[in-house]
């Protein structure tokens, strides 16, 4: 390969890495946004179902107590995302990707994920997140 071809190859490889980082960050923002929507939907559903549950008080339509043991959950009821964040507070994913020269983003799970989504909307925190990680912007990709 000539020097010109090598330079072109290196430039394309660099652009591919930058594009992959941008796509990763977009997917991450979308996941955080989806998580916020899911939390809002859960609270809305919980508000709708609690009055119905209080009205039934474990009785079926005939006034008899339901005796189905499969209908009882052994898991504690989910009251908030904070409770779930504490329950799922470990990760088996390595901190840095194997065989990769791309800088890894901070893993979001457990309390960090809850704080990230509860601390405000994901769009407001996303620009500061990207500048801290050193991930290039779309304009930087187009300049290369």
UniProtKB/Swiss-Prot annotation:
Disruption phenotype: A single deletion produces no gas vesicles, in situ. Deletion of gvpG1-gvpH1-gvpI1 prevents gas vesicle formation, cells still express gvpA1. A single deletion makes gas vesicles as long as the cell that sometime distort its shape. Complemention restores wild-type gas vesicles, in H.volcanii. Induction: Part of a gvpF1-gvpG1-gvpH1-gvpI1-gvpJ1-gvpK1-gvpL1-gvpM1 operon, maximally expressed in early to mid log phase. Gas vesicles appear earlier when grown in static culture, possibly due to O(2)-limitation. Keywords: Gas vesicle, Plasmid. Residues 75-94 have a biased composition (Polar residues). One of its GO terms (cellular component) is gas vesicle. It is found in: Gas vesicle. Residues 1-144 are annotated as: Disordered. It comes from the Archaea. Signal peptide: none annotated. Belongs to the gas vesicle GvpI family. This is Gas vesicle protein I1. The lineage of its organism: Archaea, Methanobacteriati, Methanobacteriota, Stenosarchaea group, Halobacteria.
